[in-house]
Regions:
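Boundary/activation segment at the start of structured domains
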Residues: 16-127, 279
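C-terminal tail/sorting-segment detector
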Residues: 312-324
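Active-site-proximal C-terminal subdomain of hydrolase catalytic domains
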Residues: 172-266
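Second-shell loop/turn segments in exported
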Residues: 33-42, 97-106, 145-151, 206-210, ...
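Bacterial N-terminal signal peptides
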Residues: 7-16
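Residue-level detector of functionally pivotal "anchor" positions at catalytic/ligand-binding pockets or at interdomain
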Residues: 281-301
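A short, glycine/acidic-enriched catalytic loop
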Residues: 86, 90-107, 122-124, 134-167
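Solvent-exposed loop/turn segments at secondary-structure junctions
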Residues: 34-38, 72-76, 135-141, 153-154, ...
Length: 324
């Protein structure tokens, strides 16, 4: 029995080290411009917080590998419109409920440029980059799409493409959850890239009808996490190989999307979408990430009260916890 226990212990230690080694090569940028406090709805914070918790606790990305650029960053001024237009609140900087600030950077053009420059200096051809964008996009007077950053700054698709072009990485996966997301695809697609969009170029993206999140990206994050914001399990591993690929997450989100929008996905090479997951490229890395202990989240006073799989979200300007 001792021998068996020893083998199991060493196996768990190996799997934990392997998972850490894989996640060491994944980096993420979460961008939510907000535009202004009149336009920065609570659900955008919820979208980002759910994904942040998923990347940290389900995908095991190191905290320092996740860069958050959201509305006015850690400025304590009110920057977020409460649900039902019931006044304004300041976006919480703690996205995972551990009592420590996670958000520091405002979603400005300068901060985004500096972030991409820093990543260019850090990342290598053995690394993978994930970029997630929610909030507002629009079309200008000439019909061209633009992304709204904080304080009414605009970012054109070609400008975002120019920021990404110097990167020398193994692959880049991009998820765009904003309106007119499809208009960004011609600028962002390319070799070694996956681009997922919540809607077509001429469409709006929509909020969930029954929860304070955006519809497509909510279901996409559920697929990656393999549970919803309350911790209820979802089945997104279509081929039951232990990985959630970008294709599987996209398919799951499409099936569960209830709004009048047309999600899209493009990948070069095409099979990259089936291979790419936060556990590595699945036909290169053959082992599965194994974790027997779920991380514990904390309340705002640092007390260990609930699992990270239970939903921390904002409604009416107040942090709330959905218990199973």
């Amino acid at each position: 029995m001792k021998r068996i226990a020893s083998v199991i212990l060493w196996s768990l230690m190996f799997c934990t080290l392997w998972a850490q080694n894989v996640s060491d090569h994944f980096y993420a940028v979460i961008l939510s411009g907000g535009r202004s406090r009149l336009m920065n709805h609570e659900r955008y914070w919820n979208d980002c917080a759910f994904l942040y918790r998923t990347l940290r606790h389900d995908c095991h990305l190191p905290q320092q590998h996740i860069i958050l650029l959201m509305s006015d960053g850690d400025d304590p001024a009110p920057d977020m419109l409460r649900s039902g237009a019931m006044g304004f609140a300041s976006s919480p900087t703690d996205l995972d409920g551990d009592g420590l600030p996670d958000l520091h950077l405002a979603a400005t053009r300068q901060n985004l440029m500096q972030t991409m420059t820093q990543l260019c200096n850090v990342l290598s051809t053995s690394d993978h980059l994930f970029i997630y964008v929610v909030d507002h996009a629009d079309t200008n007077e000439t019909g061209e799409a633009c992304l709204w950053l904080w304080n009414n700054e605009q970012l054109q698709p070609d400008e975002l493409a120019a920021m990404l072009s110097p990167l020398q990485v193994s692959s880049t996966a991009i998820v765009l959850g904003h309106c007119h997301a499809g208009a960004f695809v011609p600028w962002l697609q390319g070799e070694g890239r996956i681009v997922v969009t919540a809607c077509a170029a001429d469409e709006l993206s929509w909020a969930c009808p029954d929860r304070p999140y955006d519809e497509f990206v909510y279901h996409w994050t559920c697929a990656i996490a393999q549970h919803d914001e309350e911790g209820n399990p979802v089945f997104s591993d279509q081929n039951v190989d232990g990985y959630i690929s970008m294709r599987e997450a996209f398919d799951y989100a499409c099936v569960h999307d209830r709004r009048p929008e047309t999600p899209g996905i493009t990948a070069q090479p095409q099979r990259l979408a089936e291979r790419w997951s936060f556990s590595g490229l699945t036909d290169v890395i053959e082992k599965m990430t194994v974790s027997t202990a779920l991380p514990t989240a904390y309340d705002l006073q640092g007390r260990r009260l609930y699992s990270h799989k239970q939903g921390l979200y904002i409604e009416g300007g107040q942090l709330k916890l959905k218990k199973r």
